[in-house]
UniProtKB/Swiss-Prot annotation:
This is A-kinase anchor protein 3. One of its GO terms (cellular component) is cytoplasm. It comes from Bos taurus (Bovine). The keyword Metal-binding does not apply. It comes from the Eukaryota. InterPro entries: AKAP_110 (IPR020799), AKAP_110_C (IPR018292), SPHK1-interactor_AKAP_110 (IPR008382). Residues 226-242, 620-630 have a biased composition (Basic and acidic residues). Interacts with ROPN1 and ROPN1L. Interacts with QRICH2. One of its GO terms (molecular function) is protein kinase A binding. It is found in: Cytoplasmic vesicle, Secretory vesicle, Acrosome; Cell projection, Cilium, Flagellum. Pfam families: AKAP_110 (PF05716). The lineage of its organism: Eukaryota, Metazoa, Chordata, Craniata, Vertebrata.
């Protein structure tokens, strides 16, 4: 469809409207509960309330999808469906506000659905133990955070670092510095991980009632809270010093046997360094990776699970501990994440710093980098050569078409480097591929409005043909007078010429070109490529016809040719017998002879080009028989199917290269914009030929050539600018009809689905809760009009809404029966809106709704 659509003048017919009803195999379960829509009905500004609505809706949606996935009576994974209140299912919600002083902040919301695996009937008390386990962790965290808040308010001190630990074992809290304790945490975590501990959770005292789930005797539970406060020089708006606060909460395993730790069957002292030179590289790497993963998992996972567990209760709970936890988390959310990342990166830096001293590890990294670098060497050289080529060779302004010979020279120039070295062959190939892409992009720029692609292609074809023709003439020594002649077409009019040859052996029947066997219309390929090829042939035949006439064309013959040249995609312009070729007079001056010779050059060029590319076949006419045949009857050529264009591969002579080039141009796929430019250029060519005729076209047409004769479709404005304002009524009408026929045919072909593919259904489902009935009806009518303009056969509406579909169904049936167009429907809608606005301005009430009014007045 054209980019510029005149909706009010569109002549496209309206489509039908139907109610979408799914088949038996497609049950329709489109339901939206009122509770789910409450978010849209009640525009609350409280983010916590909105998030609680969203959580409930997600829970219901997830439960609904699970019910659909497992139908009643079926088993899911070999077990019966659990009820909605099963404690093994749970939703974890995490949302916090990052609002800070001086910035609006952002609200973060995360939700995850978790289903615990079924553990059998022997673990009935696991849910209770799990609640106590997380409650114990939560209590420790809340107590530590509340203690921090109280101490902060009482003391008011700053620049302090507090390290609080809750020990569940028998050992007293060690009196050590914070950095030493942090380093020991990492060392002990790596040591504990290497002992293949079976449990993945840290059970506290009283966490598990079952004896099988008790913790090993050599492990104890440790909960650590680290609080940092850093004072900055700036002062806040309330004259209080601003401080950055962060806390770090961690729960890890600790070994009771702090003195010894068995590893790999050996006994090593616990105070040994984690990285020893005598350790094997594989054990060293495995212990490092396990330590990092255990450290990150114990810090991040345990803390976030505790937070999400708490926030699940916080939606409906208003206890003091929950409120304090909420305030603390929202206040310190950024500091928590920042401190976690900082701590992890510091430990990772220490690990990598030690790894860089290991020669085996460094050599492995170097080998890996070298392997990846060698694989990317071709791409790197490709980019370098492409850049070098663009700097050296691509400085000229891009042309639409380049010479094929120029392309091959550029490729060989760059690819000759290092041809003898077998290692550089793939690099040369990559550079050639890169150049091909660059040249392809350069050779197909966006066509400028003042010069279309077809005009540039025609100029290039004429220049190439003249060059080849002069080379052949110079070799044979036939025409020496044309060596210094200009390669431009004279602009002034030619005098009428008598009927004998133009200075070269020519027979009138040669103009018609070898006659092809006409094919049936259903065998032709009606696509954009065939349209473009036929338009090119039409343009070339029009130029050839004008050259043969010598500037004196019969007006009636031109009108017949213009009216029938482009109405069908597989036929060329009509060439009547009355408008056959004419010849120059004998004894003309040298200037006229030179012009006639130049005209003969162009004529022979186009004739040979068409015969060797478009009309070439096995049963073409013999040249000798053509010369001997003096029959005046000349039939118009018929363009063959585009599938026969491959027969031009065996051409010879001076036009072999030109034939191959034009065939390659015609065989490429052309887009819709290219076809539009072709049609525009052919129409302009017809007008130029019409204006250059000696006989005025005004004698055949009427005096009315205003805007009323223009069709109402999207016709190019440039073509209207070429049309004369005086005395070209008939020519303008015929050209417009021809262009309109092509435009309509292309639209009808593009709207049809491919063979063997059913057209997809277009289904519209509108959900407007707070809108008025008037706006709903207007929206449905505009959707119907847009679907009609896009050639949608039937528009389906799903879900009845206040009887709008029934009225629209009746309206569409009446409009299709009356033959109404899209423009007429839109004009009626505008009329109704104007009347409604006038009634509202006066104070009257509109009696009829939009659909009812259209039923009466459309």
């Amino acid at each position: 469809m054209s980019d510029r659509v005149d909706w009010l003048q569109s002549q496209n017919g309206v489509c039908k409207v139907d109610v979408y009803s799914p088949g038996d195999s497609q049950p329709q379960d489109w339901k939206m509960s009122d509770e789910s829509l409450s978010i849209f009905k009640e525009a609350s500004h409280d983010p916590i309330r909105v998030l609680s609505w969203l959580r409930r809706d997600l829970e219901k949606s997830t439960a609904g999808f699970q019910d659909i996935r497992f139908k009643p009576g079926e088993s899911s994974l070999g077990r019966e469906m659990v009820s909605s209140g099963d404690p093994r299912k749970g939703f974890c919600v995490d949302y916090y506000n990052t609002t800070s002083r001086g910035s609006p902040g952002r609200l973060h919301f995360e939700m995850s659905h978790r289903e615990n695996p079924h553990q059998g009937p022997t673990c009935n008390g696991s849910s209770v133990d799990e609640v106590s386990f997380y409650a114990n962790r939560l209590t420790n965290l809340v107590i530590a955070m509340a203690r921090k808040e109280i101490n902060e308010k009482i003391d008011g001190s700053e620049n302090r670092c507090v390290h609080q630990s809750v020990y569940m074992g028998d050992e007293p809290p060690p009196n050590k510095s914070l950095s030493k304790v942090a380093s020991e945490l990492v060392n002990e975590t790596v040591t504990a991980c290497s002992k293949n501990t079976p449990s993945d959770k840290a059970p506290g005292s009283g966490d598990r009632a079952s004896g099988t789930l008790q913790s090993p005797p050599n492990l104890k539970y440790k909960s650590t809270l680290k609080i940092k406060e850093s004072n900055k020089g700036g002062r806040g708006p309330d004259d209080r010093p601003s401080s950055k606060k962060s806390f770090f909460y961690k729960e890890v395993f600790e070994s009771r046997n702090a003195g010894d730790a068995k590893e790999g069957g050996r006994t090593l002292p616990a105070e040994r360094k984690m990285f020893r030179g005598y350790e094997r590289p594989d054990d060293f790497t495995a212990s490092i990776s396990q330590g990092i993963m255990t450290y990150a998992n114990s810090v991040v996972s345990d803390m976030m699970v505790s937070i999400m567990k708490t926030l699940k209760i916080q939606v409906k709970d208003t206890t003091i501990a929950t409120i304090v936890l909420k305030k603390v988390l929202i206040k310190h959310a950024k500091e928590v994440v920042s401190d976690l990342i900082d701590s992890f990166m510091k430990n990772l830096h220490n690990v990598t710093g030690t790894l860089m001293t290991d020669t085996d590890f460094v050599s492995a990294v170097k080998r890996s980098f070298f392997s990846h670098g060698s694989q990317k060497a071709t791409d790197i050289m490709d980019a370098m050569l492409g850049k070098l080529y663009s700097v050296i060779f691509a400085k000229k302004p891009p042309e639409t078409v380049r010479k094929t010979k120029d392309k091959s020279e550029s490729y060989s120039l760059v690819s000759m480097k290092g041809m003898g070295d077998p290692k550089h062959r793939n690099v040369n190939f990559a550079s050639m591929k890169s150049e091909g892409k660059v040249r392809e992009r350069v050779c197909t720029p966006t066509p400028k409005p003042e010069k279309s692609c077809v005009e540039t292609l025609g100029e290039h074809i004429i220049k190439e043909g003249l060059t080849l023709w002069h080379n052949s003439q110079q070799k044979e020594g036939i025409s020496a007078c044309l060596q210094g002649s200009p390669f431009v077409t004279p602009k002034r009019q030619y005098k009428p010429v008598p009927d004998f040859p133009l200075g070269f052996p020519f027979d009138p029947c040669n103009f018609s070109l070898p006659m092809q066997c006409p094919e049936k219309p259903e065998n032709f390929m009606c696509d954009s490529d065939s349209w473009a090829k036929d338009l090119l042939v039409s343009a070339l035949l029009l130029i050839q016809y004008h050259l043969a006439q010598g500037g004196n064309m019969d007006a009636q013959s031109f009108l017949e040719a213009a009216g029938t040249s482009n109405l069908y995609p597989t036929k060329s312009p009509a060439v009547s017998h009355e408008s056959s070729l004419r010849s120059p007079q004998v004894g003309a001056d040298p200037e006229e002879v030179e012009k006639k010779d130049l005209m003969s050059v162009f004529f022979n060029l186009i004739r040979n080009l068409l015969s060797e590319t478009i009309f070439k076949s096995d049963h073409s006419c013999d040249p000798k028989a053509t010369k001997e045949d003096n029959s005046p009857q000349c039939e118009r050529p018929v363009t063959p199917s585009p599938a026969k264009l491959n027969e031009c591969d065996e051409t010879g002579g001076a036009f072999a290269g030109l034939t191959k080039m034009v065939a390659n141009k015609l065989d490429g796929h052309m887009n819709g914009q290219m076809v539009d430019h072709l049609m525009d250029s052919v129409m302009k060519l017809c007008l130029i030929i019409a204006k250059s005729c000696d006989s005025p076209l005004a004698e055949l047409g009427d005096d009315k050539s205003g805007d009323a004769s223009r069709p109402t479709s999207a016709f190019p404005e440039s073509l209207y600018e070429c049309l004369s304002t005086k005395g070209t009524g008939t020519a303008e009408t015929l050209l417009q009809n021809a262009y309109q026929a092509i435009h309509n045919e292309l639209r009808s072909l593009s709207a049809q689905p491919p063979e063997g593919c059913t057209a997809p259904k277009v289904i519209v489902s509108n959900h407007n809760l707070t809108d008025t009935v008037q706006n709903k009806q207007l929206q449905a009518v505009l959707q119907w009009v847009a679907a009609s303009e896009l050639n949608v056969p039937i528009l389906y509406f799903a879900g009845d809404d206040e009887g709008i579909q029934e009225k629209l169904l009746q309206l569409s049936a009446a409009a299709v029966e009356k033959g109404r167009s899209v423009g007429e429907v839109l004009q009626s809608v505008l009329r109704y809106e104007k009347e409604r606005q006038l009634d509202e301005a006066v104070g009257n009430v509109t009696r009829l709704q939009l659909l009812d009014w259209l039923m009466v007045n459309l």
